Amino acid sequence: MSGDHLHNDSQIEADFRLNDSHKHKDKHKDREHRHKEHKKDKEKDREKSKHSNSEHKDSEKKHKEKEKTKHKDGSSEKHKDKHKDRDKEKRKEEKVRASGDAKIKKEKENGFSSPPQIKDEPEDDGYFVPPKEDIKPLKRPRDEDDADYKPKKIKTEDIKKEKKRKLEEEEDGKLRKPKNKDKDKKVPEPDNKKKKPKKEEEQKWKWWEEERYPEGIKWKFLEHKGPVFAPPYEPLPDSVKFYYDGKVMKLSPKAEEVATFFAKMLDHEYTTKEIFRKNFFKDWRKEMTNEEKNIITNLSKCDFTQMSQYFKAQTEARKQMSKEEKLKIKEENEKLLKEYGFCIMDNHKERIANFKIEPPGLFRGRGNHPKMGMLKRRIMPEDIIINCSKDAKVPSPPPGHKWKEVRHDNKVTWLVSWTENIQGSIKYIMLNPSSRIKGEKDWQKYETARRLKKCVDKIRNQYREDWKSKEMKVRQRAVALYFIDKLALRAGNEKEEGETADTVGCCSLRVEHINLHPELDGQEYVVEFDFLGKDSIRYYNKVPVEKRVFKNLQLFMENKQPEDDLFDRLNTGILNKHLQDLMEGLTAKVFRTYNASITLQQQLKELTAPDENIPAKILSYNRANRAVAILCNHQRAPPKTFEKSMMNLQSKIDAKKEQLADARRDLKSAKADAKVMKDAKTKKVVESKKKAVQRLEEQLMKLEVQATDREENKQIALGTSKLNYLDPRITVAWCKKWGVPIEKIYNKTQREKFAWAIDMADEDYEF
């Protein structure tokens, strides 16, 4: 193209004085030649280029017509001046077009093509060509046609590349800033991606920033779909037999269903317990037909083996499911969750905790519960009480059924309730722990505990004075309060004998639950506690107490039998009334919450070293948490897989130690080479080996910390205190102060539950 231009230029200079018509013919030939070349390129380009071609042709026609009229006018001098100006513009345009062609070529090499922009031809041609030395490369002038230019279409493949890069970076969790900021401004996709997380944040209901409802009002609008009932019983296949006294016996559907509950637990320890077997057989017979009752009279003659094997095979089959089958089940569960797992409360979508009704089965209980083995009957719609607002759509019961009752009580937080048949207790469907109602309750609980901090010294002085009271009732109350404060004991509720497991709290302690030691293990005035607490978890502790407490306990135990109450003049009602007099809202649980939270805060201050790395700080946190769990007696049985997991962890530690030893040998060898060689390459090798050793040392330390943590916590339940007794703002403040990621302490569910604390607390927060 550039050669043709030079040839044309020289031709114009040589024939400058020739006839006007000849000049125009040459000029048009040149123009047509260029136009043909552009036409070839444009066949590959998009519709926009075609549009430019049509504009080009139109401009040529206009030019010809204008030429004719101007020649007819005969104003040749004026005409010549104009052509001088036009020729200048033409030369500039040709230069720009030549550079544009080179640019297009380069862009094609880079993986995308940009259609050449053909400008409209000038209205007239000139005859004067300026000297070559005056011609300078210029930027492409912007004219009206450029306003139609759309860079978004040209950079289509750029956008695709950028999208792909962004996706790859998001997968790695490292979203980098784009190198070319101008491109980002033109391309809308990345901007949309950046805005998505912000939208998610906006959707989170920051209820703690809103004005609270009047006392007692829990909500103003509540709508939900009701509960999901347990699926109906599916009879066993004919190939699965039940035997009684060695003979096959076909059971009625109701009797068979209850028999399957026992068969599923056949290998469990429960089915060997006499009380479990007795309660089960009694309730099973209630579901039998008269004929079955006459035949089945002894549980020991019943053979549930085939039933048990059938359910084991089903469990194994579920484990062996294909990915497609598992995905199908997951999708069905998600569909169910989407429909029934959420409610609308005060124009906000809130998650429901337990929207499924518990299926029928056998009651287990904790410890040696007197009712273990009894039949938990199937809950029907006729047992259900629905709670929603008056202006909400009442959920529809299953076809052929109706609800027991529909209420509109906005002073309670439950959505659905029913009464279970074992102990006659009321069961509820409630909102998820991350909901506003649950969050407000937690916040209020910790604020009450903080109020106790202001008057706890006064209360302690008061009960110390009461140890010397002339009234036995006051002395017993003061000693009980001392135990609740110092040992974080629960108050203990009064229970009907034979109805529940024999668990006790502070007020219900019996003489048999404590032993007094004037001196034990080098300590004076030691009280030895041994009783079953909540959930039949054993509380065993040896505690040195103040002398006056010890003397009072000796007095309380005088002339009493082991089964007699230690605090015979005290009950939970009397104690709670006294606590309310000391501070509004004060209960034994508030004392537990206060002591747990204050212990965590003190332990974190003592155990956290500023120069420790993150894993060491997390170990310090878990040790502080464990101190609280021990105080609150949050125990657990060691996991069944504990020994195996510890062996696996130890083998990892041993392997890491070997790797570290090898790395240290390599470093030593590299240092020796560096002393001899004394060049830059060997120095780099030494630095590389040093970094490898440091990395392995860190990895080994993490594994050792993990092993220590597991061993120390194998019988301690850290989660109970973390979720229920520790003010989360203490943890959040500690994380922010020491740069520990909150994800290392709280999992996703816990972060949702404590969103209010994470948003509210800063590093200077004090309980």
From Swiss-Prot:
Protein name: DNA topoisomerase 1
Cross-link (Glycyl lysine isopeptide (Lys-Gly) (interchain with G-Cter in SUMO)): K105, K119, K155
UniProt function note: Releases the supercoiling and torsional tension of DNA introduced during the DNA replication and transcription by transiently cleaving and rejoining one strand of the DNA duplex. Introduces a single-strand break via transesterification at a target site in duplex DNA. The scissile phosphodiester is attacked by the catalytic tyrosine of the enzyme, resulting in the formation of a DNA-(3'-phosphotyrosyl)-enzyme intermediate and the expulsion of a 5'-OH DNA strand. The free DNA strand then rotates around the intact phosphodiester bond on the opposing strand, thus removing DNA supercoils.
Activity regulation, short description: Specifically inhibited by camptothecin (CPT), a plant alkaloid with antitumor activity.
Cross-link named Glycyl lysine isopeptide (Lys-Gly) (interchain with G-Cter in SUMO2), sites: 103, 105, 119, 136, 150, 155, 160, 166, 174, 206, 338, 551, 644, 702, 714
Stretches with biased composition (Basic residues): 24-39
Origin species: Chlorocebus aethiops
Organism superkingdom: Eukaryota
Region (Disordered), start-end ranges: 1-201
UniProt PTM: Sumoylated. Lys-119 is the main site of sumoylation. Sumoylation plays a role in partitioning TOP1 between nucleoli and nucleoplasm. Levels are dramatically increased on camptothecin (CPT) treatment.
Family assignment from sequence similarity: Belongs to the type IB topoisomerase family.
Chain residue numbers at which the record places covalent cross-link Glycyl lysine isopeptide (Lys-Gly) (interchain with G-Cter in SUMO1): K119
Record-linked Gene3D superfamilies: 1.10.132.10, DNA Topoisomerase I, domain 2 (2.170.11.10), Topoisomerase I, Chain A, domain 3 (3.90.15.10), Yeast DNA topoisomerase - domain 1 (1.10.10.41)
GO CC list: chromosome; nucleolus; nucleoplasm; nucleus
